[in-house]
A protein has these predicted regions:
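Cytoplasmic membrane-interface "Motif A"-like loop-to-helix N-cap segments
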Residues: 84-95, 358-372
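C-terminal transmembrane helical hairpin of 12-TM major facilitator-type secondary transporters
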Residues: 362-412
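Juxtamembrane intracellular "pre-TM" segments in multi-pass secondary transporters
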Residues: 7-18, 260-300, 492-496
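Glycine-rich segments within core transmembrane alpha-helices of 12-TM secondary carriers
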Residues: 165-193, 345, 433-443
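Extracytoplasmic gate region of multi-pass secondary transporters
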Residues: 42-46, 295-350, 409, 444
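Residue-level signature of mid-helix packing/kink "hotspots" within the transmembrane helices
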Residues: 40, 68-76, 178-179, 342-350, ...
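C-terminal ends and interior cores of transmembrane alpha-helices
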Residues: 96-125, 373-387
């Protein structure tokens, strides 16, 4: 149905409806981007915490692992919460609580000193890691209150005939938020803090921490970090303040449904016979069994999603750290490079969708194979860059990797909807989401351990292997159909 035909039936309400539609899209995009400001700031703060306290990659890995699992659980729980409460209330409250947890993280060192009575030593560090871990896990639970409200609110304002197009644009919000987060926090950590670079004892302590963690050019890096003691805290304070403002903006700017502002519902979006009971419970159970639980294409996509997330989060979560420690970049250059990886992902996502329709006739799984091969290729180039490679080749290879890895991340969700059909899309994507968050957690755990015990080169090699495995998993479904509607039509309900 053409856009004009869809909205022209709203009559005199059309202009007001379109205004509220644009407002809803913009507010949710900005709001969800701010969620990433109080989520991805941790990645930028990690190098500073290693320098000042000697926190190991293994410890960070465990924090990321449990945080990712908590986020996945929260997304699942809050998917039900938004059906009972106003989506704008859940989203605004979630961002408010994220702001408070970020303030708490910034004061983590003070709290650890209060608990232990000291501000250094093994006991202090252990309590600090515990406090940070608990705070990140709590923050990740509140993070899970961000996406479900958007998934519920937007279909009330956007007609199904253009939902995919506008949601693909909306989906760039997390990439925009993550990119801006690492850039802003990179500036803060390189500009704020107390200058103790003239204190030989402080510089020596920092160099010892960096040497213990295998940081490249530790002597010069120690002077840089000593000039900005405590700057990592600002990576939490500033985004937290932004989140407070964002929470207020979300609550004021959003409305869950058109009727809340005196507008009619979108035409042709009633529940219809299927959701009103047209399919019996027994038939629905069999439908989901065939289209989801016994659908090998669904499971292939879900398993591949785990590998996609390991590659993506292995770079995004750890980028600032391995670029400073393994490649010797300063923190500002490292964060700009990580941001470029994320921005390239936006372009790659849009290109992957376009290429799927124009070159592969809607068969997104084939485009995913190309993307995983591209990601593996660019990570291989990155692995073999010379030790003295400048920022240009380093950034170029990570931009290439980002361009390719974000294609599968977006396409898998769309393709699951096609393979499971729209009636079982949510269930199929739920499974993929759980495995994706597991992959994110494993990326944190694996990278932390491998970096500490085998070095960053082994980390890059692991990411390459994971990308190749993901590619072969997707190759196994090269001959899969474009969608599962023919399969759904052939289900035999006679023996239900």
């Amino acid at each position: 149905m053409a856009k004009e035909n869809v909205y022209s039936s709203l009559g005199e309400h059309r202009k007001k409806f379109m205004s509220w539609q644009m407002r809803t899209i913009l507010v949710t995009m900005i709001g969800y981007a701010i969620f990433y400001f109080v989520r991805k700031n941790f990645s930028v703060a990690m190098p500073g915490m290693t320098a000042e306290y000697g926190i190991t990659n293994k410890s960070f890995g465990w924090i990321i692992f449990f945080g990712s699992l908590t986020y996945g659980f929260s997304r699942f729980v809050n998917g039900y919460t938004v059906d009972r409460y106003k989506g704008r209330l859940v989203m605004a409250l979630g961002l408010l609580l994220c702001a408070l947890s970020n303030f708490a993280f910034g004061y983590g060192a003070n709290l650890s000193s209060l608990i232990t009575g000291v501000d250094s030593g093994p006991d202090f560090i252990n309590i600090l890691i515990l406090v940070m871990g608990v705070t990140i896990i709590v923050n990740q639970f509140f993070q899970g209150m961000g996406y479900p409200p958007c998934a519920r609110i937007l279909p009330h304002w956007i007609h199904p005939s253009e939902l995919a197009t506008k949601m693909s644009i909306w989906n760039c919000s997390h990439s925009i938020g993550a990119a801006l987060a690492v850039v802003v926090c990179g500036y803060l950590i390189g500009s704020m803090g107390t200058d103790l670079s003239n204190n030989a004892e402080v510089v020596a302590a920092i160099q010892g921490n960096l040497d213990a963690n295998g940081v490249k050019d530790a002597a010069n890096q120690a002077l840089v970090y000593a000039a900005h003691i405590g700057a990592w805290k600002w990576c939490f304070y500033v985004p937290a303040c932004l989140a407070l403002v964002g929470a207020i903006g979300i609550y004021i700017g959003l409305r869950d449904e058109p009727k809340e502002v005196g507008l009619p519902d979108l035409p042709d979006t009633g529940l219809g016979g299927l959701k009103d009971g047209g399919m019996s419970a027994a038939r629905r159970k069999k439908f989901e069994a065939v289209m989801v639980w016994k659908n090998r294409w669904v499971w292939t996509f879900c398993i591949a999603n785990l590998f996609v997330y390991v590659v993506r989060m292995g770079v995004l979560d750890w980028g600032p750290k391995f670029l400073t420690e393994a490649r010797g970049l300063d923190i500002k250059s490292a964060t700009w490079t990580t941001a470029a990886f994320e921005i390239a992902g936006i372009i790659g996502t849009l290109f992957a969708g376009w290429a799927t329709d124009h070159f592969f006739k809607g068969k997104g799984h084939r485009m995913c194979v190309v993307c995983m091969a591209g990601a593996a290729l660019f990570m291989t180039i990155f692995r073999f860059l010379p030790a003295d490679a400048g920022i240009t080749p380093i950034a170029a290879t990570l931009v290439g990797a980002g361009f390719f890895i974000y294609g599968p991340q977006a396409l898998i969700g769309i393709e699951l909807g096609n393979q499971a059909t729209k009636e079982a899309s949510a269930r199929a994507n739920g499974i993929a989401g759980i495995l994706g968050y597991l992959g994110s957690g494993l990326a944190g755990l694996l990278v932390g351990y491998i970096a500490d015990f085998f070095g960053w080169t082994a980390v890059f090699e692991t990411i390459i292997v994971v990308a190749i495995i993901g590619m072969f998993i997707l190759i196994s479904m090269w001959k899969a159909p474009r969608d599962g509607y023919e399969r759904a039509a052939s289900i035999n309900y006679n023996n239900e």
